[in-house]
Amino acid sequence: MILDYNPSMKQQLACMMTAYMAELKSDIPEEIIRGRLSDYIDEMSEKGIIRIRIAFDGQLPIAFSVFQIDRQESDWCMRPGWGFIREYYVSPEYRKQGVGKILAEDTEYILQDLGAADLYLTSTGAVPFWQKCGWRLTAAVTPKGQSILEKHF
């Protein structure tokens, strides 16, 4: 089951976000992730700047997607009007079981429904996954060296 995020899911998202950041080898302390970052995500979500979808196995949250339509109001706007998957995570024990693909399709559908004909994302280690989902690796990279992938409808 995949649900839209709401503030009652804050703790669940914070737990997954902590695991996600650890996997990325981020130096952001856990208390910041569970505090200010979680508050920031709530604020951006409430303003309608980002959308968040969380996948569950029963009551257990197992994956999330944070995405937006790039526009000037957002804190990240590389390609105005494009759909952008900002953050994406599937718990390790649920990888290679189809959860990631289902959540990706769900996210893409919503972005398309919001008016995006073109999508992009950045990735450090999941390029093969995204390519299997129909995304194309571009020659461009972010200032942090992340690969940029695109998908067009």
Name each model feature, range by range.
Residues I54, L60-I69, F84, Y89:
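Conserved beta-strand in the GNAT
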Residues I85-Y88, D118-T122:
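Conserved hydrophobic beta-strand within the GNAT/NAT acetyltransferase core sheet
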Residues D42-I54, F84:
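A short helix-loop-beta-strand connector motif used in the catalytic cores of GNAT acetyltransferases and
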Residues D113, A117, T124-I148:
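Conserved active-site alpha-helix within GNAT-family acetyltransferase domains
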Residues W76-P92:
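Conserved acetyl-CoA binding element of GNAT-fold acetyltransferases
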Residues V90, K96-Y109, K132:
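Conserved acetyl-CoA-binding loop-helix of GNAT-fold acetyltransferases
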Residues M1-C15:
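A short beta-loop-alpha structural element at the N-terminal edge
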Residues T18-I41:
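Conserved GNAT-fold acetyl-CoA-binding loop/helix
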